[in-house]
Amino acid sequence: KKNIEAYQEKLLQLDQRLTELSAKAPQKLFVTTHAAFGHLAEDYGLQQVAIMGISPDAEPTPADLKNLISTIKDNQVKYVFFETLVSPRIAQTVAEASGAETLVLDPLEGLSEAGRNNGDDYLKIMTRNIDNLELALGVK
């Protein structure tokens, strides 16, 4: 029971950080490789724009890329997120074309071998995700 309560407290701390992030962030829009973060965005009043829709394997059209690059520039988005288990190639291309940089936002779909070797778990990965969101949305 103590372990459950301790873990619940850590989850509440993550939720509190995300709530504070949403309240403090001057930028609410973030760009991701694919639309894996809709629930997070909706729950915390943020706006996700995905390069490739739902599937991480889909290829955007040239028109999609042009519109996305315009959105990034118009909204002064400083970072384009990519995922740990997906090639960062398209995110890097979009970032370069728009003057942004890339960061990792992990959808927690699986652990890489490096992640397993580092002892990563849900709490550690979400903490890194929040750190990166704070940076991307102008809180840090």
Which residues does each PLM region occupy?
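Extracytoplasmic metal-acquisition and chelation regions
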Residues: K1-K140
